[in-house]
A protein has these predicted regions:
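Helical element adjacent to the flavin cofactor pocket in flavoenzyme catalytic cores
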Residues: 180-238
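Mid-domain catalytic core of redox enzymes
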Residues: 223-326
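Glycine-rich FAD pyrophosphate-binding loop
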Residues: 20-44
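Conserved flavin/dinucleotide-binding core of flavoenzymes
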Residues: 311, 317-439
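Conserved FAD-binding subdomain of flavin-dependent enzymes
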Residues: 35, 42, 47-80, 127-130
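Conserved Rossmann-like nucleotide-cofactor binding loop
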Residues: 11, 35, 255
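Mobile amphipathic helical/loop "lid" adjacent to a hydrophobic cofactor/ligand pocket
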Residues: 69, 73-172
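N-terminal Rossmann-like FAD-binding beta1-loop-alpha1 element of flavoenzymes
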Residues: 2-29
């Protein structure tokens, strides 16, 4: 069987790695850019290792990447962010983030009665008896809840932090999604971790697994321009060649899939997903020649909805000796009247971020060796809110497979890319077995 995978990000690499284990499957992975990894692409500059976004993994002991580690034989190390060094700032007051019982007892975000209420909510989530799963959205649940406003604000902020979205969007996250996500996170013994060495450690090993099979081609800088069906095979056309395949996997944002299938018999089936919106944030990375300050590992500004991670406090492999790597992230609102309004908003976010750096890391400007600012970085191709629809891995009357962080799968962000890709690979292999039995 010959398989085409379109897209060389985390999902495409994962699907190809699983399929490459089967000696009867060969294929081509098409990637239009010069490098693999997609938004997990990693590069070095002046001794600093930079990602296009964070490489934190939430609840790693219950995460899909741990399953992949076992099934694909991956080798990597991770380090947990020190929970005692994770802080929230509200109205210029610093307090521990309520990541566990110890921090919850220490935090000043809630009074003693509110803490008891919040512990009760966490316990109910863990036991799968919290009724948030019966509400269409977090906003609907909070509207009927008799909890104090501080408890409601904390729920909103937790969802903002884990889903990388603004409070108004956090209220649109479906209740069942929140219930399942926090059930896993609250049960985890390792809530926030970094893959030491960044995503490159994972993507390099996935590529190596694919290469070692000898049956797969990694076609970099080769975009697929059209997909057709003829003589019981799929015909994929690129700028320089035309190839035939038995199965096709789309491992790319749904917005790009719609463009590629425009004018094809399958275009109408993609219409329900055309209006999906992406999760986008501002990313502000600074690599410092020396450690200017290390008051904590993470500071979240609850008032302005942005945070700074001292990435090098957890992962020392990303910096030259004596250096410091700080990453600022700002959650972004959508829906501006015009481009001028959007630009003014982004400029104000940049100023807020720099003010946060000034406040907690004085002297950073003079010690900056590397700076990278992305005012609109995609974190997930589909924001998991009620007004969007995640793309299923299979659609009725459409002969393709779909995977990625915008598809139905376990978890959020990278975990959904991994889980949907693993599901697709297993479905193709199962489909192949059934075809053999049928013949």
């Amino acid at each position: 069987m010959k398989v085409a995978i379109i897209g060389g990000g985390l999902a495409g690499l994962t699907a190809a790695a699983y399929l490459s284990k089967d000696p009867t499957v060969e294929g081509v992975l098409f990637e239009r850019s010069p490098q693999l990894g997609g938004r997990a692409f990693t590069y070095e500059k002046a001794g600093f290792t930079l990602n296009y976004g964070a490489h934190a993994v939430y609840g790693i002991d219950r995460h899909e990447i741990t399953v992949m580690e076992r099934e694909l034989g991956l080798t990597f190390h991770s380090k947990q962010v020190d929970k005692r060094q994770v802080m929230y700032a509200k109205h210029d007051q610093l307090t521990p983030a309520p990541l566990d019982f110890v921090n919850l007892m220490r935090t000043e975000l809630l009074n003693p009665r509110q803490k008891v209420r919040f512990v009760g909510e966490i316990t109910a989530i863990i036991a799968h008896i919290h009724n948030i799963k019966n509400y269409s959205t977090l906003g609907e649940y909070l509207a009927q809840s008799n909890a104090d406003e501080d408890v409601k604000e904390l729920w909103e902020h937790l969802v903002c932090s884990n889903f990388f979205i603004t409070p108004e969007e956090a209220r649109k996250v479906p209740g069942p999604v929140i219930s399942e996500y926090y059930h896993n996170l609250f049960l985890s013994n390792r809530p926030v971790n970094y893959i030491l060495g960044s995503w490159a450690v994972i993507t390099n090993q996935l590529r190596e697994k694919i290469d070692l099979s000898g049956r797969w081609e990694l076609a970099l800088q080769e975009a697929v321009e059209s997909v057709n069906y003829a003589e019981r095979q799929f015909v994929l056309k690129t700028k320089h060649r035309e190839l035939r395949f038995d199965r096709v996997v789309f491992a790319m944002p749904v917005q790009q899939i719609g463009k590629l299938l425009k004018g094809s018999p399958w275009e109408p089936f993609m219409v329900p997903y055309e209006s999906n919106t992406a999760t986008e944030v501002m990313v502000y990375d600074i690599g410092l020649k020396r450690v200017v300050a290390r008051p904590f590992s993470y500071i979240s500004d609850m008032d302005n909805k942005l945070f700074i991670s001292d990435v090098s406090a957890t992962d020392h492999t990303l910096v030259p000796e004596g250096g410091q790597l700080l990453q600022g992230i700002a959650y972004l609102s959508d829906g501006f009247a015009d481009e001028e309004e959007r630009k003014a908003y982004l400029d104000s976010k940049t100023k807020q971020m720099e003010a946060l750096f000034d406040h907690y890391y004085p002297g950073w400007r003079e010690e900056t060796a590397v700076k990278r600012v992305s005012k609109k970085a995609m974190v997930a191709s589909v924001k998991n809110i009620a007004t969007n629809r995640l793309l299923p891995t299979r659609i009725d009357h459409v002969p393709f497979y779909f995977c990625g962080d915008g598809c139905v799968g376990k978890g959020e962000l990278a975990e959904r890319a991994f889980s949907s890709a693993r599901q697709v690979a297993k479905a193709i292999l199962e489909d192949m077995k059934l075809s053999c039995v049928g013949n």
